[in-house]
């Protein structure tokens, strides 16, 4: 029986499952001639969650790409950086596996592994993060660390990062909590000096402190549909412990910090180790030896480094890698411009000597892969300006002389007479 008479006209209700009376529980929910208390509802939820957790990895395992598959996808879009790809593939796989199985596995709490990418300008840090988000079909947003300031100061609050992520998925909190956030220029928020100052460092150490809880995992309160916060407003609650944070930076000068640590203790005077200029380590070799203490010396606070346990270093791109970037990836620059010209019904051809010249120019500018587009854009500017007004052009050829500025691109016409007239 789920109800008993307490006295004349009084009914005492009991839970049909555990037998507790309505006075022993917080809430008793009525059904057709049955009752269930809040404690039994919670117990049922726990049982269902546990069963789903046991089934989920087996059911969803095939949907999550393996580290080998993630690496293969990155290879399609990013040239080189083999070590960084492997580190990212494992870290991303473990992160999403942790989300699918719950934060605990067999009673062991699984920690969060955010990622720090260290590499020179134009080495592919941003592209790697974008490609990962596209493969996993999760919301992705980028933030510039140089625009962030502590709360209460002019500039962007760190919680604006989560707001941008929510905007990417139409304010769907569940989707946002599975997203990826890439924070660029993270090296620019390093401490300005080792010495304490009477002036507040609101865009350096202050921002690192503000980012700590966000990166580690907290419940961020974000205004719905953007706008400023005010006391009467209801906020969206976003659990950042499920969001993967990838921080990247060029860390100019870090190689000198690493070198100082490496040579420390080698002796002085006659006992000192003498190194020739040719024996000096390259930027890539120096970055490969990076230790947490080097990042602390550079200006990142120990707590912040602790929240980024996975460190991947990217190498400088040489001329051969830049040539590969121009023609090999699925969305290679030459393929993009060829597709653009194809919309005009014109074939675009880059000769090998032209690709070599573009790569050499980018190397001279020290802009890495990022500088390739500006070079190609400048070379093709006049052609793209004139082409829509010209009739009968079937092909445009770019060679080394065009890149050097010694001649204009060669235009081949369908009609030989038009070709002859254009050559005059």
From Swiss-Prot:
Signal peptide location: none
Keyword Metal-binding belongs to the record: yes
Residues annotated as binding ATP: 120-127
Sorted UniProt keywords: ATP-binding, Chaperone, Metal-binding, Nucleotide-binding, Zinc
GO function terms (MF aspect): ATP binding; ATP hydrolysis activity; ATP-dependent protein folding chaperone; protein dimerization activity; unfolded protein binding; zinc ion binding
GO cellular component: HslUV protease complex
SUPFAM superfamilies on file: Glucocorticoid receptor-like (DNA-binding domain) (SSF57716), P-loop containing nucleoside triphosphate hydrolases (SSF52540)
Pfam families recorded: AAA_2 (PF07724), ClpB_D2-small (PF10431), zf-C4_ClpX (PF06689)
Residues annotated as binding Zn(2+): 15, 18, 37, 40
InterPro entries the UniProt entry points to: AAA+_ATPase, ATP-dep_Clp_protease_ClpX, ATPase_AAA_core, Clp_ATPase_C, Clp_protease_ATP-bd_su_ClpX, ClpX_bact, P-loop_NTPase, Znf_CppX_C4
Domain ClpX-type ZB: 3-56
A GO BP entry: proteolysis involved in protein catabolic process
Its job: ATP-dependent specificity component of the Clp protease. It directs the protease to specific substrates. Can perform chaperone functions in the absence of ClpP.
NCBIfam families: clpX, PRK05342.1
Family note: Belongs to the ClpX chaperone family.
Oligomer and partners: Component of the ClpX-ClpP complex. Forms a hexameric ring that, in the presence of ATP, binds to fourteen ClpP subunits assembled into a disk-like structure with a central cavity, resembling the structure of eukaryotic proteasomes.
Annotated protein name in UniProt: ATP-dependent Clp protease ATP-binding subunit ClpX
Organism of provenance: Aeromonas hydrophila subsp. hydrophila (strain ATCC 7966 / DSM 30187 / BCRC 13018 / CCUG 14551 / JCM 1027 / KCTC 2358 / NCIMB 9240 / NCTC 8049)
